[in-house]
Swiss-Prot record:
Main location group: mitochondrion
Keywords in alphabetical order: Mitochondrion, Mitochondrion nucleoid, Transcription, Transcription regulation, Transit peptide
Pfam families associated with the record: mTERF (PF02536)
Cellular localization per UniProt: Mitochondrion; Mitochondrion matrix, Mitochondrion nucleoid
The protein's name in its UniProt record: Transcription termination factor 2, mitochondrial
Gene behind this protein: MTERF2
The keyword Coiled coil appears for this protein: no
Assembly information from the UniProt record: Monomer.
Organismal lineage: Eukaryota, Metazoa, Chordata, Craniata, Vertebrata
Amino acid sequence: MLWKLLLRSQSCRLCSFRKMRSPPKYRPFLACFTYTTDKQSSKENTRTVEKLYKCSVDIRKIRRLKGWVLLEDETYVEEIANILQELGADETAVASILERCPEAIVCSPTAVNTQRKLWQLVCKNEEELIKLIEQFPESFFTIKDQENQKLNVQFFQELGLKNVVISRLLTAAPNVFHNPVEKNKQMVRILQESYLDVGGSEANMKVWLLKLLSQNPFILLNSPTAIKETLEFLQEQGFTSFEILQLLSKLKGFLFQLCPRSIQNSISFSKNAFKCTDHDLKQLVLKCPALLYYSVPVLEERMQGLLREGISIAQIRETPMVLELTPQIVQYRIRKLNSSGYRIKDGHLANLNGSKKEFEANFGKIQAKKVRPLFNPVAPLNVEE
């Protein structure tokens, strides 16, 4: 999942917005800022500014984010606001949407209504739609390739993706929907063939594909050549078809985002760090595919973090999945385990490993053992009379 995008304020660039005489050498910055803002304001479309004020929009935010929209001759402030209100947005929500996505006011109402109908194909009702727009206004107001978007939505529905997943993809990976639908179909065929070629079954392939697309839709932006090169490289490294299938099942489409060079670098680093044979390394990778996925700098940082905590290479090799944890998470968990008297460097890393939920469950068991009484309080005592 995955798969959440923001714009940076560029207010300081206002001073260079248009050519003007240079201010005095020691002129205060604030004076320069005010001067250029006034100059920009004189070129703004006053009708646009007035209509935005009526919608309770903070014009200063728009000037900082995308002041160019205020210079446009043709804008549709009232029309866009009306469409949002028809969907159920109140005045505060409308103002927030326009402040965060100012380019909405230069979208034609006709195009926005078409976009509205398109998104309604995957939303249960208008209430759900307006919530999505409030959360991801930029994705909604990226008005282009609408016919492609519609065809791609229909294609994903035919594949079996649920509407709730498609709506999430529309907001998180809009570029996928701007792809020609034939390109997405080609990529899906390549993924299906790749799964079957390494021994996957037809029955499992559909489940795998749907999980892959819901967790990593950006795979569709890859090229078929890159996918084939990755699989061929793994085979050259001695991985059998069954082992590659295991990696595909665990890493989903993330495996296809790796290039042979990055895989080779990660393999070389792990082999050197663990001082192991090619066969042993393959077993480590199958236990922890992150050894392939993470870059060398990330693996090195995480391994050094574990070593600083007194954990040995032998312990890491026994439980390599611990490398999936960031150094910050490792430090927090070790401190928590130490507070219960559990010394991680003398024990097994399984208690350190796992998701947050799994760790808390293990920690609870350790605490329970610590406070457990040495005798059964309900058992009868053998007392001599």
